[in-house]
Amino acid sequence: MKVTLDEVAARAGVSLATVSRVLGRRGAVAESTRAKVLEAMSELGYSRSTLLHDAPRRLVAVSAPGNPEHWQVQVCTRVAKALQDHDLLVTRPLVETDPEPLQTAIEAGAVALVTTTMTSLNTEIPCIRVAEQSATEEVSEAGTEVIAARLDLGGGMTTAFEHLRAIGHRRIGLICNDSGELAVQLIRRFLAEHPARNLGLNLEDWISRVPKSFSGGSRAVLELKDATCTAVIVQSALQLHGALHGLRNRHLQVPRDMSVVGFGDSPTMKFTGPPATVLGLDVEGLSNALIDATLQTLRISTTGLPSVPPVFRPRLVARTSTTAARQ
Amino acid sequence: MSEHLPEHRHVRLAEIAGTAGVSKATASRALRDPESVSAASSAKVRQALAILGAAGQTPYAESGTREGSGAGAGSGAGSSLIALIKPAVSAGNVDPYSRLAEILTNRMFGLGIAVVHIEAIAERNEALLETILGSEHGGPTISGAVVVGGGAAGVLAGMLAERGLPLIRISNARHDDGISRIYLDATGGIETAVAHLVHLGHKRIGLAVLRDSAAPARIAGFRRSMAGILHIPATRDQAPVVEAAGGAMAGVAAAEELLDLRCTAVIACAPSLSFGMLEAAQRLRLDVPRDLSLLTVGDVPDADVVQPPLSQVVYDWATVAQSAIDEIREMIAAGDARVHVDYTVDPDLVLRASAVPPQRR
């Protein structure tokens, strides 16, 4: 039975990062801690045959798309902090909207990319990312893509629809970005899970694809209002703020005249007018999945990944931007 | 004891082959003579070396990587990197410098400079110092640093300066540490804020500040402005001040304390405190701005889109970022002949809708 560093860390009661520092003789480790780790190694019979080496100094890119959502920034920050604890250098270029920053990072020596975007970026370096739960993407030829976690958008949509349907809404619209894999998947799940999908209506009329912007949101929500929607699900926080503003300008009241559900929580969602009901994501779980996959890819941890990446289903955080539909 | 340390200095061939997804024989040939294997295999092996951090470390890999591609896979020699150092922000807290860091990052990448992001944590600073400067362990070389904010980042800046790394700090407190700095002077902003609130008719104005090294200057500035503008003795009673720890909950506690003191307007000196104020107002069923006017010194995320849009005293981050980038590049280029810079930046008042004349109370 091979002894892993995780077991050594657990036995010594220290973190994995500390064990790798002791092994690599890098960074500051208190003498007492060092002794504890070495003792744990000899007790467990740790041998040098595992793949870990002296944690060379490497640069890793941790990236969110341009104009990122709050959850994407949060996940990136947590991942960056964890990688830094393993003595890796972190660079955070924006991706998706502009290829240049990532290219600069790769030229500077980035050996892997960790990203919260769902769009396949076709990088030459390994790309550790998130995907939609049921998305069947072909694994790129070079085998550089690692799916660390899957988002259950279908489940998230169902949750939102169930919430809105329970309070009497049928005419539910979707405001989403005009580009990006997340928007594509949201639309797919929207069409598949919509409560009115079997009523012979053209659901496309209730989908508004607009840029990820404030003005996009205001425009889209009024379009959907004119298409007689009584509730909308909004992909991006900027669009959500725009939608609330657009409705206010038209002297319409949220939630009386239009119920609004956002995607992704942030501290400001409590203070929108009115506080927004949102589908919240498990930021910590997502971050941990990305961190584990990254450490695995860089051969820092050797515990082995789950053969199926963990699935995260967004959860509804009910505030006051949704209410019963008026008959 | 130390000679029995299970240290690992070399990457094994099996490991390289495993990571690259080629056979050991192919890996071996690719390392010795890249011409003898297909271009694809050679690229895979080069990449595996980079992932394992072994580029240029294994004796025979050196020639292999260099010959294979002129661009050089992984080692990143030659390209310059600048570190962007910030104090780590605990989960759930609001980062007052997120906007500035974003602008700095995007501008530097725009100039083709790769940015290395460091989150300073007091108890990890020693290790971070080694990671930042330890290019002899492989990986890229960092040629300078922009340090934003104080706390652990300030301490790390001092350690890096001692080791001779070109540095520029952007911070809201002034220390005699001999490091070049752009000083964000909030006292002018606080004076503007007080003047604005007094002009609206407020007399009981409270100040909420974070308990950090910038607090004394801010409190003194506030008291001086109150005394000068309202012609009152700026005592604890007449010009109430609450010092709070970080985090939204501390903001709520500070807000409740100031509301107890019957303040009709509050100047919050950090975004977390502003969110605390909004939260406290919500809990007490007070309406901002009708029952309580709120001015923030600093950057509240989404300030323009929350309800009500928040009036702020903010810095021109784009200019601050550009100056910092220009200065650090000049300092790196100048080497030992670099000149010390010390700017002071005053903020501007951005009026939105969170401060109105006092209504009742």
What are these regions (language model features)?
Chain A
Residues 18-20, 52-68, 171-178:
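Short beta-strand segments enriched in small/hydrophobic residues
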Residues 223-327:
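Flexible loop/turn connectors
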Residues 61, 106-117, 171-176, 207, ...:
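Periplasmic-binding protein-like
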Residues 134-137, 142-174, 184, 214-222, ...:
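Hydrophobic alpha-helical segments within soluble ligand-binding/sensing domains
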Residues 158-199, 304-322:
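An alpha-beta-alpha
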Residues 83-95, 173-174, 189, 193-215:
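Short beta-strand elements in bilobed, periplasmic/extracellular small-molecule ligand-binding domains
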Residues 1-56, 326:
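N-terminal helix-turn-helix DNA-binding module of bacterial transcription factors
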Residues 57-162:
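Alpha-helical recognition/docking segments in bacterial nutrient-uptake
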